Amino acid sequence: MSNYIVTFKDGVSKDEIQKFKDEVTSEGGEIGHTYDGLISGFSAKIQPQTLQAFQQQASISDSVIETIEPDSTVTIQ
């Protein structure tokens, strides 16, 4: 399992986001942090098959998913 940040387009309901979080956990993944400020989304350890399903969903033009990015540490020098 790898860590990813999944963000959603403006106007996506908390219930819709929860469906994606539930899918992560039902497939054995773990939710890390939930973002509900300037961006809506969550970080999670996601199983490969769940990641693939999310990526397919994100490729659809009317998808609610904005981005799926590998989670990483950002430093400022």
What annotation goes with each model-predicted range?
Residues 1-4:
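Short structural boundary motif marking the start of a folded domain
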Residues 7-15, 46:
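Short, surface-exposed ligand-recognition loops at beta-strand->loop->(often short) alpha-helix junctions
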Residues 9, 26-30:
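Intrinsically disordered, low-complexity segments enriched in small/polar residues
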Residues 17-27, 53-62:
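Short amphipathic alpha-helices in soluble, non-transmembrane regions
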Residues 32-77:
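Autoinhibitory propeptides
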